[in-house]
UniProtKB/Swiss-Prot annotation:
The keyword Transport applies. GO terms for biological process: phosphate ion transmembrane transport. The gene is pstB. This is Phosphate import ATP-binding protein PstB. SUPFAM superfamilies: P-loop containing nucleoside triphosphate hydrolases. Coiled coil: none annotated. Keywords: ATP-binding, Cell inner membrane, Cell membrane, Membrane, Nucleotide-binding, Phosphate transport, Translocase, Transport.
Length: 264
């Protein structure tokens, strides 16, 4: 039985493979992402976690020589169909990157800019406040909205990037190691925020932090890599299941070894 049986599936990958030029980077991934859940991608460096993550909003389209095979469906629609507009897709499936990357604009404009480009016609002040509240940042910045977003601390900048993402009203938030550059207190703030956000959004997070995956996610996908001829690596999905099962009683020995710290 599928680990997501009975869930409302929002995103699905089937026979998903990614090539860089002629090199196969990730092979034959199958997984389902349920709505309003947090899915963690874990695994050693070079196993394709971030590559697969970027497939879900077609960020790999921007990488020269990158080619995707297989199917990804969002609301049962194939996202690589020529009729799907990639820019519109990215407004529905937003992304938060590893390093906080606020625009060199005011805190207010960091939120308003993307919403304006996406045609938002409502009360902008209201949207800015709502987005900052959703990112648990409003109380810290409400009196300095005209200040540069770059003047904030690293943890605040990352929450500003999350606020910027939710301002365009996506359904899914992709997070590529969002806490790797943050201190433990800022990391905890992001993790607590994720639990609140999943009430309205579906979240996929790539993380190297086993404790973070076990604390925050509902489902976990463990990726590994094997060496290829020519000295490269090919990533593949070892196991996908509920986070409880992955960490407590995984089916694959490699998964047990990784989550227990015996390799990685």
């Amino acid at each position: 039985m599928s680990p997501t049986a009975g869930e409302n599936i929002l995103l699905k990958a089937e026979a998903l493979s990614v090539y860089y030029g002629n090199s196969l980077a990730v092979k034959d991934v199958y997984l389902e992402v349920p709505k309003n859940k947090i899915v963690a991608f874990i695994g050693p460096s070079g196993c394709g976690k971030s590559t697969i993550l970027r497939c879900f909003n077609r960020m790999n389209d921007l990488i020269n020589g990158c080619r995707v095979q297989g199917r990804i469906t969002f609301h049962d629609q194939e996202i690589n169909d020529g009729r799907v507009d990639a820019v519109e897709l990215r407004s529905r499936i937003g992304m938060v990157f590893q390093k906080p990357n606020p625009f060199p604009k005011s805190i207010y404009e960091n939120i308003a800019y993307g919403a304006r480009i996406n045609g938002y016609q409502g009360d902008m002040d209201e949207l800015v406040e709502k987005s900052l509240r959703q990112a648990a940042l409003w109380d810290e910045v409400k009196d300095k909205l005209k200040d540069s977003g770059l003047a904030l601390s690293g943890g605040q900048q990352q929450r500003l990037c999350i606020a910027r993402t939710v301002a365009v009203q996506p359904e899914v938030i992709l997070m590529d190691e969002p806490c790797s550059a943050l201190d433990p207190i800022s990391t905890l703030a992001i993790e607590e925020l994720m639990q609140t956000l999943k009430e309205q959004y579906t979240i996929i997070i790539v993380t190297h932090n086993m404790q973070q995956a076990s604390r925050t996610s509902d489902y976990t996908a463990f990726f590994n890599a094997r060496a290829t001829e020519g000295g490269g690596k090919m990533g593949y999905l070892v196991e996908f299941d509920t986070t409880e099962k992955i960490f407590d009683s995984p089916d694959q020995e490699a998964t047990a070894d990784y989550v227990s710290g015996r390799f990685g």
